[in-house]
């Protein structure tokens, strides 16, 4: 993509929007087990924030921000999605039974988590990897 160098307002706005969308996507990812949201919606927002940077700058700038190979990210997501339900077997429970646990935060109250967060993380990685692989393959052909 040939981008003009005088897109200063677009580039500045894209950086601000990038961080806002990432924070909102992260909050939806964490809230997904009890309220609407989760890995799919969070993954779409993460990918859309990277698409905003790609549109405002170019693919090389987006690769500097996220140097991951998105095809590998799809594989990581699938490993999390497969390993989470299988892990319940190793804990002596039925397939896909979620286990609850608390993460102690020394000064603050402990955070209550379930293993569904790991499954949602796998969905998030798979969605981001898929969307960005499609966007990059379309963008590199131009």
UniProtKB/Swiss-Prot annotation:
The chain crosses the membrane at residues 12-32, 37-57, 72-92, 116-136. Mnh complex is a Na(+)/H(+) antiporter involved in Na(+) excretion. Keywords: Antiport, Cell membrane, Hydrogen ion transport, Ion transport, Membrane, Sodium, Sodium transport, Transmembrane, Transmembrane helix, Transport. It comes from Staphylococcus aureus (strain bovine RF122 / ET3-1). It is a multi-pass membrane protein. This is Na(+)/H(+) antiporter subunit B1. The lineage of its organism: Bacteria, Bacillati, Bacillota, Bacilli, Bacillales. One of its GO terms (molecular function) is antiporter activity. Its main location: membrane. It is found in: Cell membrane. May form a heterooligomeric complex that consists of seven subunits: mnhA1, mnhB1, mnhC1, mnhD1, mnhE1, mnhF1 and mnhG1. Belongs to the CPA3 antiporters (TC 2.A.63) subunit B family. Disulfide bonds: none annotated. GO terms for biological process: proton transmembrane transport; sodium ion transport. The keyword Acetylation does not apply. InterPro entries: CPA3_antiporter_subunitB (IPR050622), CPA3_sub_B (IPR005281), MnhB (IPR007182). It holds the Pfam family MnhB. GO terms for cellular component: plasma membrane.
């Amino acid at each position: 993509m040939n981008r003009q160098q005088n897109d200063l307002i677009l580039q500045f706005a894209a950086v601000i929007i990038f961080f806002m969308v990432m924070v909102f996507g992260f909050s939806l990812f964490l809230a997904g087990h009890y309220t609407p949201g989760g890995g799919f919606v969070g993954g779409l927002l993460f990918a859309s924030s990277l698409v905003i940077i790609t549109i405002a700058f170019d693919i090389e700038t987006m690769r500097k921000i996220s140097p991951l190979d998105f095809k590998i990210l799809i594989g990581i997501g699938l490993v999390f999605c497969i390993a989470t339900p299988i892990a319940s077997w190793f804990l002596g429970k039925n397939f896909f039974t979620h286990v609850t646990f608390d993460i102690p935060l020394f000064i603050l109250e402990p955070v209550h988590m379930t293993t569904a967060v790991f499954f949602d993380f796998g969905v998030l990685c798979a969605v981001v990897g898929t969307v960005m692989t499609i966007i990059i393959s379309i963008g590199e052909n131009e």
